[in-house]
C-alpha cells in the first residue's frame, strides 16, 4: 500500500496551489453592503467543552472566498475577511527566519465571520433521506455558519466552539458528507470516532445507534468483549478511545484491510493531547495520516491560543494545513459565567484544606446559587460525604419542598436526602446512585456532592457548578485535575435543556488561580506530551517497520505535533534537552534524543540491530502487541528463570500498569482481614507468621487476585460493608489489566525458553479466566448457576472437578444441589458443551549426539466438541512440552474450531542420559481445570527396546540399548537372527553384522577388550583375510554393505570396519545388502563415534546393577492432581504410546495419523521444535485477541 512516507522529511517543500490566498493581501478582502457599519466584528476563536465536543468539521475557505456554499448570506449581511481578522502571523516558527512565499501559502487558513442577523438554515437543505438524522428542523447559528465547511468540503478541519453550541451536529454533517460522496455505498467505508473517555464514547453510541439507520455503529473500548470486538470491527461507524485504537493499529498487518477502508476520522477533545495519555492520540493520528490515503480529519478542541499548530500538524493529502473554524462564547446556547477563587493555606495536609474549602462553600452558594440546583465536585469519596454532612449541619438550604420517593440503603445518604442534600460516588451501590440521580432530576435534591463520576454521562439540571479543590487522588498521590476533567465539570453548568443561564466556580490554591483562569479563557498554550513516553511508541513503530534507522525515526517525528511545538518552544521540553548537546540545532537535538531512546531499547533487548537496521525482537513484538509499558516489559525480561506460581503472581502485581491504584487509609483493615484468611494461597506474613502491614499497591493487587480466585467471603467486621463496592471496582480494574500482562509474559517466557515460568503463567491465566484456582474444587463455579454454596454441597458428595461433574446425571445434580426437578438438565447441558480433549504421544526415533540423547516424538491431538464457544468465549488450546529441568521444548496454540479433525506434529528434544522427564500438556486457556498432562520418563526407553537388549542400564540410555544383543551362555556369540518388534517390523541383519558378536564377546572380558583395543594393520595384512576388502586407516577391513553414506548409516561395520579376526571367508556374493526400508526402521547410530577404541571403552565400562524392566508406560496427571497408571488402559497399544482422554466424558480412540519421518535435527532444542517445518500445527506464540 502506498503511504505518505514518500513525503516524509519534505516539510519545507510545498506544492503551489492556484487557490492559495495571501491573507495579508488587502485584495483578498470582500465587503458587502452594511446596514450598520458599527456592528462589532467577532473573531472565530477556539473554545471547547469536552462533553459536547463530539463533532469533526472540515472548512473549505476557498468556497467562501469564491461565494460558493454561502446561500445563507445575503447582501444585508455584515460579512468580511480582512488581514487583521485572519490573525495569521508571518512566521511558522519563532525563529527569526525569513519565510518564502511557499511557506506562507502553507499557513493555516482561519476564517473569521461577523455575526449575521440572517435566519438559521433549515434541515430542508439536506436530502430527504438525511433529515431523519436530526430531531430538529432548523440548525442553530453556529451549525449554519459551519455548514459549508463541513457538508460542502472534504478538507481537514479543526473546529473550536463553546460547550452547548451543538458541535455533535457538525460530526453528523461530516458523516452525511461522506455518505453523499460514496453515493450511499457504505459497504467499503469506515468512520472512526475517537473520544478520550469511555463515558463520552458510550454517550455518542447511544446518540448515533438509533440515528443512522443505514449505518451500523459499534463501540471499541477496554470493556468490550472479544465477540463484541469482532462485531464492532465490521461496523461502518467505530466509536473508540485512543488507547484502544492504538492497540488495534499496532497490528497493522493483521487489519490492513480494515484501515484501508477508513475515510473519515472524527476526533473529540483533541486538546487532551497535552496530557500524558494524549501521546496515544498524537501517535494514532500521525499513523493514520501517514499510512492512509484519502483520509479526512475533523477535530474539535477547547479554546487554545495556538490552534494553528494543530492545523499545521494535521495536514491534508496535498500537504496543506487543515482549515480552522473558531467560534467564541457568543455562540453558546446557554450563557455561562465563570469564576476562579484562590485561597491561601497555612497547612500542608490536604484533608485540612478540604475542611477549609467546606467553610467557604456557604458564602459561594449564597452568592451564586440563586436558590437553584447546585452540583459540587469533590476530590475524594470521603470528601463528598463530609461536604454533604457539613452543609446539612449548617442548614444551607431549607428542607426541599418535594419529598424523596427513595430510601437508599446507606443510612447517612438517607438522612441527607430527607433534607434535600445528597452525595454521589462510585463507592455506593448502583441502586443508591440511580436513586440520587432521579431525585436530583425531579427537584427533590437541591445540593448534590459528587466525585467526577457525574462530569460526563447523565445530564443534570445544575445551575451552579462548584469545583471544590482542583486536586484529586491519582497514582497514590494528590495531583491536579486534568484540563479535560475541569472543562467537563464546568460544562455541567446551565445545560441547554434545563437552563438559559449558568454559573461555574473553581475553588483552588492561590498559586494555581492564574493557571485555571488561562484554561477557562483559552489562553493556555497547547503543548505535546509525546516525549514523555516516546520510547514505547518508538518500539511500536519499529515493530511496524515504520522506523528502522535513526533517519526514519526522525522523519516519523517530523509528522507529529511534538515536532511542530518543539521547533517553536524547545524550552518546554526539558526531558529532551537532558540527553542532547546544549548548543545543538533543532534537528540535531531530535536526532540525539531518538538515538538515545533507540540505544536504550537495544540495551534491554526490545529491539536489536541486524544488517545495519533496527529490528523488533520477540520481546518488542510482545510489548507492542499487548500494549505493555516500557517499565513492565523491562521487568518481565529481567525476571529470574524458573519462577514459581507465587513468583509469577508477585511479578504481575508489581507491574507499572497498577501504579494508578492506591491503598486507601480505610482499606488497610479490610485487606488485613483478607490477608489473615486461612483460604488465602500466598499471604503476606512476617518472619513470626504474623500479617504484614498492607500499604503497598502490589500487596493490594495480589490480595485482590487471590480473594477472587480463592472464593473468599467478604470480611464481616463492623463497617466493612461500606467498602464492598470499592473492592468490587478495584478488582474489576485489576482483572482488566491482568489478562494482557499475563499474555505478554507468556510470549516473554517462550522467547526465554523458560518452561517452568511459562507453565505457572498459563496456570494463573487459566485461573483468572475461570475466576478460581485451577487445582481446587472452585473450578465448578465456572458452570452456570453454580456458586459457593453449590460448590460446598458438591464437595460433600465427593465431586471436586469438572470431569467428576460430567459423570453425574441430571437427577443426581438435582439431588446434590437440592434443585427443583428439571433444573439439573440445564447444568448437564452446560457441561456437555465442554470440549473433550485428546492427546497421544509416541517416541519415533532415538539417537546419541555428544553424550546426549536426541528423541523425536510424534504428538497427536484432537477434540470432540459441540461448539467452539463456551459462555461467549472462543476456546483455544495451549500445547506445552517441557523438560523436568524446567527448559521449554515446544509451545503451540490452536483454536478449538481448528480441530474438526485430528492434528499432528513432531517434537525433537535433547535430554541428558540421567533420569530426566519430558512433560506434554494440553489445556484449554479459557476454562480452568480442563486439561491433561503426560510425563514421559527416560525409564520408558528400556521398555521400548527391551526386545533387543533385556539387560540394559536404564540410567545410561545410550547406544547399547538400541543395538546390542546378549551373548550365549557358553560364552560363544549368540545368534543374531531376525528379531520381531511389537509393531510387526523385522530387523534385517547381514553377515557383516558379526561385528556385534565381536563387541559382545569383548564386553564379557575387560582384559580381552584391553588386549584387543588396539589392532595394528600389520597384524592382518595378508590378502588371505581381505578377500577383496579394502583396509581402513584404523586397520579394520571394509564391509560389503551397499549403504550410500557409510559415515551416516546405522551399521557399526560401515563406520568402524571389521577386525581381521572376525572376517568370514565368504565372497561378496554371499552378503545380502540391507534394504532401504530396513535402514529406516533401524535405530540411528551415534554420529560422533568414529573409532573402535572409543566405542570399546564405553562398552567395557564396569556394568552397574541391571534393573528390572519398568512396565509403566507413562504417568498422566489429571487436574486436580490425580495420577493414573495407564499400563492397564494401554495394554492394547505399543510401548511408548500414550493416550490422553480429557473432558467430562470419555472420548473415542483417535485414528493415528501417518506422519512422514524426519531425520533433521537442530542443535537448539527449543528452536527446532517450535519452528518444526514438518509439523502441521503452526506455532502461534501468545496470539491473543485484545480485550
UniProtKB/Swiss-Prot annotation:
Residues 16-30 have a biased composition (Polar residues). Disruption phenotype: No phenotype during vegetative growth, transition of double strand breaks to later recombination intermediates is partially blocked, crossovers are reduced and distributed randomly, with a high incidence of homolog non-disjunction at meiosis I. About 10% of wild-type level of meiotic divisions at 30 degrees Celsius, at 23 degrees Celsius delayed appearance of meiotic divisions, which eventually reaches the wild-type levels. Decreased spore viability. Residues 616-922 form the SEC63 domain. ATP binds at residues 161-168. InterPro entries: DEAD/DEAH_box_helicase_dom (IPR011545), Helicase_ATP-bd (IPR014001), Helicase_C-like (IPR001650), Meiotic_Crossover_Helicase (IPR052247), P-loop_NTPase (IPR027417), Sec63-dom (IPR004179), WH-like_DNA-bd_sf (IPR036388). Residues 1158-1171 have a biased composition (Low complexity). It catalyses: Couples ATP hydrolysis with the unwinding of duplex DNA by translocating in the 3'-5' direction; ATP + H2O = ADP + phosphate + H(+). The keyword RNA-binding does not apply. SMART domains: DEXDc, HELICc, Sec63. Its EC number is 5.6.2.4. The keyword Transmembrane helix does not apply. Its cofactor is a divalent metal cation; Zn(2+). GO terms for biological process: DNA replication; homologous chromosome pairing at meiosis; meiotic cell cycle; reciprocal meiotic recombination; resolution of meiotic recombination intermediates. A zinc finger (C4-type) spans 1039-1054. A motif (DEIH box) lies at residues 268-271. SUPFAM superfamilies: P-loop containing nucleoside triphosphate hydrolases, Sec63 N-terminal domain-like. Residues 148-322 form the Helicase ATP-binding domain. Keywords: ATP-binding, DNA-binding, Helicase, Hydrolase, Isomerase, Meiosis, Metal-binding, Nucleotide-binding, Nucleus, Sporulation, Zinc, Zinc-finger. Mg(2+), Mn(2+) and Ca(2+) support ATPase activity equally, Zn(2+) does not. Mg(2+) and Mn(2+) support helicase activity. Might have a zinc-finger. PANTHER family: HELICASE FOR MEIOSIS 1, HFM1, ATP DEPENDENT DNA HELICASE HOMOLOG. Oligomerizes. This is ATP-dependent DNA helicase MER3. It comes from Saccharomyces cerevisiae (strain ATCC 204508 / S288c).
Amino acid at each position: 500500500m502506498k503511504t505518505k512516507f514518500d513525503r516524509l522529511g519534505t516539510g519545507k517543500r510545498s506544492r503551489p496551489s492556484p487557490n492559495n490566498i495571501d491573507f495579508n493581501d488587502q485584495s483578498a478582502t470582500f465587503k458587502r453592503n452594511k446596514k450598520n457599519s458599527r456592528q462589532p466584528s467577532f473573531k472565530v476563536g477556539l473554545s471547547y467543552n469536552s462533553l459536547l465536543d463530539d463533532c469533526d468539521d472540515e472548512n473549505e475557505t476557498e468556497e467562501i472566498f469564491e461565494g460558493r456554499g454561502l446561500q445563507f448570506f445575503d447582501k444585508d449581511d455584515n460579512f468580511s475577511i480582512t488581514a487583521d481578522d485572519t490573525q495569521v502571523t508571518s512566521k511558522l516558527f519563532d525563529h527569526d527566519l525569513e519565510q518564502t512565499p511557499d511557506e506562507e501559502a502553507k499557513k493555516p487558513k482561519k476564517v473569521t465571520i461577523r455575526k449575521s442577523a440572517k435566519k438559521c438554515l433549515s434541515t430542508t437543505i439536506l436530502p430527504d433521506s438525511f433529515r431523519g438524522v436530526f430531531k430538529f428542523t432548523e440548525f442553530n447559528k453556529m451549525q449554519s455558519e459551519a455548514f459549508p465547511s463541513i457538508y460542502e468540503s472534504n478538507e481537514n478541519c479543526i473546529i473550536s466552539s463553546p460547550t452547548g453550541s451543538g458541535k455533535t451536529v457538525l460530526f453528523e454533517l461530516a458523516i452525511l458528507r461522506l455518505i453523499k460522496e460514496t453515493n450511499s455505498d457504505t459497504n467499503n467505508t469506515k468512520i472512526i470516532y475517537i473520544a478520550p473517555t469511555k463515558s463520552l464514547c458510550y454517550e455518542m453510541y447511544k446518540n448515533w445507534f438509533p440515528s443512522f439507520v443505514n449505518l451500523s455503529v459499534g463501540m471499541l473500548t477496554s470493556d468490550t468483549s472479544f465477540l463484541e470486538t469482532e462485531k464492532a470491527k465490521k461496523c461502518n461507524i467505530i466509536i473508540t478511545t485512543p488507547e484502544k485504537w492504538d492497540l488495534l493499529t499496532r497490528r497493522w498487518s493483521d487489519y490492513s484491510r480494515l484501515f484501508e477502508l477508513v475515510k473519515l476520522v472524527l476526533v473529540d477533545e483533541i486538546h487532551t493531547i497535552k496530557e500524558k495519555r494524549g501521546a496515544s492520540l498524537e501517535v494514532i493520528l500521525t499513523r493514520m495520516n501517514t499510512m492512509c490515503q484519502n483520509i479526512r480529519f475533523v477535530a474539535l478542541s477547547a479554546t487554545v491560543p495556538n490552534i494553528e499548530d494543530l492545523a499545521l500538524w494535521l495536514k491534508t493529502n496535498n500537504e496543506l494545513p487543515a482549515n480552522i473554524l473558531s467560534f467564541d462564547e457568543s455562540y453558546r446556547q446557554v450563557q455561562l459565567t465563570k469564576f476562579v477563587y484562590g485561597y491561601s493555606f497555612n497547612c500542608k495536609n490536604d484533608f485540612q484544606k478540604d475542611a477549609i474549602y467546606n467553610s467557604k462553600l456557604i458564602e459561594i452558594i449564597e452568592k451564586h446559587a440563586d436558590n437553584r440546583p447546585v452540583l459540587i465536585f469533590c476530590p475524594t469519596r470521603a470528601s463528598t460525604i463530609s461536604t454533604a454532612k457539613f452543609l446539612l449541619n449548617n442548614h444551607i438550604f431549607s428542607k426541599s419542598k418535594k419529598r424523596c420517593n427513595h430510601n437508599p440503603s446507606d443510612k447517612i445518604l438517607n438522612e441527607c436526602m430527607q433534607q434535600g442534600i445528597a452525595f454521589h460516588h462510585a463507592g455506593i451501590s448502583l441502586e443508591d446512585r440511580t436513586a440520587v440521580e432521579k431525585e436530583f432530576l425531579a427537584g427533590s435534591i437541591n445540593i448534590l456532592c459528587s466525585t467526577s463520576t457525574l462530569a460526563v454521562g447523565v445530564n443534570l439540571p445544575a445551575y451552579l457548578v462548584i469545583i471544590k479543590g482542583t486536586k484529586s487522588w491519582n497514582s497514590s498521590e494528590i495531583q491536579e485535575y486534568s484540563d479535560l476533567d475541569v472543562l467537563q465539570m464546568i460544562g455541567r453548568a446551565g445545560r441547554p435543556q434545563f437552563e438559559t443561564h449558568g454559573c461555574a466556580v473553581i475553588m483552588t490554591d492561590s498559586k494555581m488561580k492564574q493557571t485555571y483562569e488561562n484554561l477557562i479563557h483559552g489562553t493556555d498554550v497547547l503543548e505535546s506530551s509525546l516525549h514523555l513516553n516516546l520510547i514505547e511508541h518508538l518500539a511500536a513503530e519499529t515493530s511496524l517497520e515504520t522506523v528502522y534507522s535513526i533517519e526514519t525515526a526522525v522523519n516519523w517525528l517530523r509528522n507529529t505535533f511534538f515536532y511542530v511545538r518543539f521547533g517553536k518552544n524547545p524550552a518546554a521540553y526539558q526531558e529532551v534537552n537532558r540527553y542532547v548537546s546544549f548548543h545543538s540545532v533543532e534537528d540535531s537535538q531530535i536526532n540525539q534524543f531518538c538515538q538515545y531512546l533507540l540505544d536504550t531499547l537495544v540495551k534491554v533487548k526490545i529491539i536489536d540491530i541486524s544488517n545495519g537496521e533496527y529490528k523488533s525482537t520477540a520481546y518488542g513484538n510482545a510489548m507492542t502487541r499487548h500494549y505493555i509499558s516500557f517499565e513492565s516489559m523491562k521487568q518481565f525480561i529481567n525476571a529470574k528463570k524458573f519462577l514459581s506460581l507465587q513468583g509469577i503472581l508477585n511479578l504481575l502485581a508489581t507491574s507499572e500498569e497498577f501504579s494508578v491504584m492506591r491503598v486507601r487509609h480505610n482499606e488497610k483493615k479490610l485487606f488485613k482481614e483478607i490477608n489473615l484468611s486461612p483460604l488465602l494461597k500466598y499471604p503476606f506474613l512476617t518472619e513470626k507468621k504474623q500479617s504484614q502491614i498492607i500499604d503497598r499497591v502490589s500487596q493490594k493487587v495480589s490480595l485482590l487476585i487471590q480473594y477472587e480466585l480463592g472464593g473468599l467471603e467478604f470480611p464481616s467486621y463492623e463497617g466493612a460493608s461500606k467498602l464492598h463496592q470499592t473492592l468490587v471496582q478495584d478488582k474489576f480494574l485489576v482483572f482488566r489489566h491482568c489478562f494482557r500482562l499475563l499474555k505478554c509474559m507468556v510470549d516473554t517466557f517462550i522467547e526465554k525458553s523458560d518452561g517452568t515460568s511459562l507453565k505457572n503463567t498459563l496456570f494463573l491465566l487459566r485461573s483468572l479466566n475461570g475466576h478460581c484456582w485451577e487445582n481446587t474444587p472452585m473450578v465448578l463455579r465456572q458452570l452456570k448457576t453454580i456458586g459457593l454454596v453449590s460448590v460446598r454441597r458438591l464437595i460433600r458428595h465427593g465431586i471436586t472437578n469438572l470431569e467428576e461433574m460430567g459423570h453425574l446425571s441430571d437427577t443426581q445434580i438435582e439431588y446434590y444441589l437440592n434443585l427443583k426437578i428439571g433444573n439439573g438438565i440445564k447444568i448437564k447441558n452446560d457441561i456437555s458443551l465442554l470440549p473433550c480433549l485428546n492427546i497421544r504421544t509416541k517416541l519415533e526415533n532415538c539417537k546419541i549426539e555428544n553424550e546426549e540423547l536426541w528423541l523425536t516424538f510424534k504428538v497427536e491431538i484432537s477434540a470432540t466438541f459441540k461448539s467452539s464457544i463456551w459462555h461467549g468465549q472462543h476456546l483455544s488450546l495451549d500445547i506445552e512440552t517441557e523438560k523436568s529441568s524446567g527448559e521449554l521444548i515446544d509451545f503451540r496454540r490452536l483454536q478449538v474450531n481448528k480441530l474438526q479433525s485430528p492434528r499432528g506434529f513432531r517434537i525433537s528434544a535433547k535430554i541428558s542420559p540421567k533420569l530426566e522427564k519430558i512433560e506434554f500438556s494440553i489445556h484449554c486457556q479459557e476454562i480452568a481445570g480442563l486439561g491433561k498432562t503426560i510425563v514421559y520418563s527416560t525409564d520408558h526407553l528400556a521398555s521400548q527396546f527391551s526386545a533387543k537388549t533385556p539387560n540394559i542400564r536404564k540410567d545410561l540410555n545410550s547406544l547399547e540399548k538400541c543395538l546390542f544383543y546378549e551373548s550365549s551362555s557358553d560364552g560363544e556369540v549368540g545368534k543374531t537372527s531376525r528379531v520381531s518388534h511389537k509393531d510387526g517390523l523385522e530387523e534385517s541383519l547381514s553377515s557383516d553384522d558379526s561385528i556385534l558378536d565381536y563387541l559382545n564377546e569383548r564386553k564379557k572380558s575387560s582384559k580381552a577388550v584391553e588386549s584387543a583395543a588396539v589392532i595394528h594393520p600389520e597384524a592382518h595384512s595378508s590378502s588371505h583375510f581381505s578377500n577383496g576388502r579394502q583396509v581402513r586407516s584404523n586397520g579394520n577391513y571394509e564391509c560389503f554393505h551397499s549403504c550410500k553414506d557409510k559415515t551416516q548409516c546405522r551399521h557399526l561395520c560401515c563406520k568402524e570396519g571389521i577386525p581381521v579376526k572376525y572376517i568370514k571367508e565368504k565372497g561378496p556374493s554371499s552378503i545380502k545388502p540391507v534394504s532401504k526400508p530396513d535402514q529406516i526402521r533401524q535405530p540411528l547410530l551415534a554420529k560422533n563415534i568414529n573409532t573402535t577404541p572409543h566405542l570399546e571403552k564405553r562398552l567395557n565400562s564396569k556394568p552397574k546393577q541391571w534393573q528390572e524392566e519398568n512396565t509403566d508406560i507413562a504417568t498422566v496427571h489429571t487436574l486436580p492432581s490425580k495420577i493414573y497408571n495407564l499400563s492397564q488402559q494401554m495394554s492394547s497399544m505399543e510401548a511408548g504410546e500414550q493416550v490422553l482422554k480429557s473432558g467430562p466424558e470419555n472420548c473415542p480412540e483417535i485414528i493415528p495419523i501417518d506422519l512422514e519421518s524426519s531425520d533433521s535435527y537442530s542443535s537448539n532444542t527449543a528452536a527446532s521444535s517450535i519452528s518444526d517445518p514438518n509439523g502441521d500445527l503452526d506455532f502461534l506464540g501468545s496470539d491473543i485477541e485484545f480485550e
